[in-house]
């Protein structure tokens, strides 16, 4: 089925919402970390148990009579994986083992009761729902909102929670210039590290005389211990794809490339699936939603060279050349991919775009700080009690991240230092724990 216009998209979205409804939704973490810990077998076992029960059918991405078992993206609480979330109760089961599946099935799926021993406990307190757990309570999950809550391998789950509403609004209610102005007014800054104003970059590309332009996504996440972009690509690929589509509409580009390192095989597979499904229903390709806007998206696998995270080296790699940074100017906005004007942003930056277009620049500026609005995803790793993927408002302090979200240092040891920003970052000591996390 090809969606030909805005009305058909709205009707299809409603259909997807109906298909996603179920008396009980079981979301087994299908992120790389949990899969490595055995969540794939847990998923298959829960599926098998549900099938064996009379009157309950399990099929990924299809309408189900009573119970839906889905393989989601990363839930974020990697220290406690494998994770299983049960809705509508919002129970989050931690460190689930294969032998726990029958008890989960009998007690929770059939009986609605929590399996107490699988719930998170801290300092003598048991937290039944995911939202109450301190690790999640202080986060503001916007970019990661759907990760762990939707079937990452089926477009229906993404559409049911609002995917492609931003590009729909842009195509039917906004001019390309208005889209760029909205992103500029929001003061969204690049989440790849440099913090350059995204709207300004788009303005520079749109102002070029050359009419052939490209949109490129930098998914070459090379910093040791970083897995923010990987988790977005694995858990909510349509959000990033939609952001690229909006950028393409804004600068009048018709072709885009996602550059992903080959060490992210699951992210690549889920991106392939997402692109294929979007093409199948007409959300990618020619004359999207019956408009004059066409956009084709490709995936390019990187070989893992750290230097290819730099813009000019990345575009050279896509072209089949050696990934080496070049002298600037010209910059990628002037001569990027194949010497054409190119919008180049990272995964998290694009993932912010649909929300800004849908909700407006003022909404986005109401989060974070005036100079660094919005949120930022971080990979919290090392000698803390709760490692994982977090998303916090800009302006939060290091102390809040490490102690309120991370739970402090393991075994109550003394804090020594925190390394931030990968190889290009640095180390901060105890007297800097109240430093705010922002670009300035």
Residue ranges of model-derived segments:
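Short amphipathic, charge-patterned alpha-helical segments
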Residues: 49-50, 243-247, 395-410
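Local cysteine-cluster metal-coordination motifs and their immediate loop/turn environment
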Residues: 23-41, 66-88, 188-197, 306-308, ...
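Hydrophobic alpha-helical positions that pack around
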Residues: 268-394, 406
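Terminal amphipathic helices with adjacent charged low-complexity linkers/tails
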Residues: 97, 105, 124-127, 255-279, ...
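Iron-sulfur-cluster electron-transfer modules
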Residues: 2-9, 41, 123-322
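Iron-sulfur (Fe-S) cluster-binding modules
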Residues: 1-28, 36-71, 87-185, 253-258, ...
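Structural motif
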Residues: 24-26, 66-68, 83, 91, ...
């Amino acid at each position: 089925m090809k969606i030909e216009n805005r009305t058909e998209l709205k009707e299809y979205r409603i259909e997807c919402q109906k298909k996603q409804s179920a008396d009980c939704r079981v979301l087994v973490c299908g992120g790389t970390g949990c899969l490595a810990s055995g969540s794939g077998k847990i998923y298959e076992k829960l599926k098998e148990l549900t099938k064996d029960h009379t009157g309950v059918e399990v099929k990924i991405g299809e309408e189900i009579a009573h119970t839906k078992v889905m393989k989601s993206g990363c839930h974020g609480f990697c220290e406690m994986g494998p994770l299983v979330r049960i809705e509508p109760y919002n129970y989050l089961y931690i460190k689930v083992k294969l032998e726990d599946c029958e008890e989960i099935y009998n007690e929770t799926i059939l009986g609605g009761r929590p399996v107490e021993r699988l719930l998170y406990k801290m300092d003598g307190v048991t937290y039944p729902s995911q939202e109450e757990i301190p690790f999640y309570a202080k986060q503001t999950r916007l970019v990661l909102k759907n990760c762990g809550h939707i079937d990452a391998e089926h477009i229906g789950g993404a559409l049911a929670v609002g995917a492609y509403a931003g590009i729909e609004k842009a195509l039917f209610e906004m001019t390309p210039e208005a889209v760029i102005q909205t992103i500029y007014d929001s003061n969204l800054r690049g989440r790849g590290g440099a913090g350059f104003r995204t709207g300004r970059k788009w303005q520079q590309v749109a102002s070029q005389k050359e009419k052939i332009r490209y949109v490129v996504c930098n998914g070459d996440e090379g910093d040791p211990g970083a897995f923010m972009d990987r988790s977005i690509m694995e858990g909510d690929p349509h959000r990033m794809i939609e952001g690229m589509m909006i950028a393409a509409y804004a600068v009048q580009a018709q072709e885009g490339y996602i550059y992903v390192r080959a060490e992210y095989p699951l992210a690549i597979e889920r991106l392939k699936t997402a692109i294929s499904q979007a093409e199948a229903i007409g959300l990618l390709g020619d004359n999207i939603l019956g408009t004059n806007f066409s956009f084709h998206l490709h995936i390019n696998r990187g070989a893992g060279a750290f230097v290819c995270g730099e813009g000019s080296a990345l575009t050279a790699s896509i072209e089949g050349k050696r990934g080496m940074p070049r002298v600037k100017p010209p910059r990628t906005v002037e001569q990027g991919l194949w010497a054409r004007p190119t919008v180049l942003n990272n995964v998290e930056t694009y993932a912010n775009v649909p929300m800004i277009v849908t909700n407006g620049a003022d909404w986005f500026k109401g989060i974070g700080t005036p100079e660094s609005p919005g949120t930022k995803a971080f990979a919290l790793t090392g000698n803390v009690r709760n490692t994982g993927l977090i998303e916090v408002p800009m302006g939060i302090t290091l102390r809040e991240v490490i102690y309120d979200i991370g739970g402090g240092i393991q075994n109550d040891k003394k804090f020594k230092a925190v390394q931030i920003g990968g190889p290009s970052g640095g180390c901060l000591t105890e007297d800097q724990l109240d430093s705010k996390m922002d670009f300035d």
